[in-house]
Regions:
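Metallo-beta-lactamase
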Residues: 83-148, 253, 257
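Conserved beta-strand hairpin/beta-sheet module of binuclear metal-dependent hydrolase folds
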Residues: 1-44, 148-166
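Short histidine/acidic/glycine/proline-rich micro-motifs that form metal-
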Residues: 6-8, 89, 95-96, 228-233
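Active-site neighborhood of phospho(di)ester-bond hydrolases with catalytic His/Asp-centered motifs
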Residues: 29-32, 51-59, 92, 162-168, ...
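Active-site metal-binding motif and surrounding structural segment of the metallo-beta-lactamase
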Residues: 35-87
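Active-site-proximal loop/helix segment associated with metal-binding centers of metalloenzymes
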Residues: 10-12, 123-193
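Cap/insert and terminal regions of metallo-dependent hydrolase folds
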Residues: 169-258
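Short, glycine/acidic-enriched loop or turn micro-motifs at the edges of active sites
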Residues: 7, 24, 33, 61, ...
Length: 263
């Protein structure tokens, strides 16, 4: 389920984040930039008690601040005896440190104690592997020069391969780990035809045209495009897919918030 599809400063949709549900448990990837994540979960019919795993790609506000609210919601559920087990949180050291420090500074002493007791923190390193929510996952640094960030390659119980490149263009260092995905998830800040207006490259982002090129060079079978501007929502699906299709002949999905994609 795609909880949000927008870039940092969107107001007409939520920031990019999603949940992968393989029937074992649910993995949330990022949480957007505020307590709107609670609204998105409610609209998607996902109870906080059903979120057992959370992976954070990096510590930018539009990805990590929503995680503070997820953590607080878990604490609240624990106090109501409505959350079993622990919330498993994954990320590289910096993003884990940022999340933990914000929670320490903003939670009551009692709530932060519950947070510490009922979370399992897993600090990831480049190339490490984990079994999470039924998936075999390999995490990798995207080699960002802006903010340390990780993506992943996951294999579902059904054998489908999902590659998430984070919210920056592909770095050639990750070409091998990103090859031949059944589903490639990549950002596109805007259409290439509107690059002069939005200046995506200055923000370490790319365009729908670039997303199509990336999917083609990586031999992906399906492409999901997200982390976009929100000025073109009524026409976004058609326009972005058409531009990406100039270079990519596979299946292209440009989801709206709360859309579900069957992997």
């Amino acid at each position: 389920t795609i909880l949000g599809t927008g870039s940092a400063f969107v107001t007409r949709c939520y920031n990019t984040c999603f949940i992968i549900d393989c029937g074992v448990s649910r993995l949330m990837v990022d949480a957007g930039g505020g307590n709107g994540i609670l609204t998105q979960l409610e609209k998607a019919g996902v109870a906080i008690a059903d979120v057992g795993h959370l992976f954070l790609t990096h510590a930018h506000t539009d990805h990590v601040i929503g995680a503070v609210w997820v953590a607080r919601a878990v604490v609240n559920a624990v106090k109501k005896q409505a959350y079993d087990g622990a919330l498993h949180i994954y990320g590289h050291k910096r993003v884990i440190d940022v999340l933990t420090e914000i929670c320490r500074l903003t939670f009551s002493k009692k709530d932060f104690g519950i947070f510490q007791e009922r979370t399992v923190i897993d600090v990831l390193t480049d190339g490490c592997q984990r079994k999470i929510a039924g998936m075999d996952m390999t995490f990798f640094s995207i080699h960002s020069t802006k903010e340390e960030q990780y993506g992943f390659r996951a294999v579902t119980p059904e054998g489908k391969t999902v590659v998430c490149l984070g919210d920056e263009p592909l770095n050639d260092a990750n070409r091998d780990v990103a090859q031949n995905a059944d589903w490639l998830l990549t950002e596109a800040f805007c259409l290439h035809s509107e690059a002069e207006r939005y200046k995506p490259y200055e923000k370490h982002h790319s365009t729908a045209l670039d997303a199509g090129k990336t999917a083609a060079t990586l031999h992906a079978r399906n492409l999901i495009i997200y982390h976009t501007e929100d000025d073109s929502l009524p026409s976004r699906q058609k326009a972005y897919a058409a531009e990406a299709a100039l270079n990519f002949s596979g299946h292209i999905v440009v989801p709206d918030d709360l859309d579900s994609v069957t992997l």
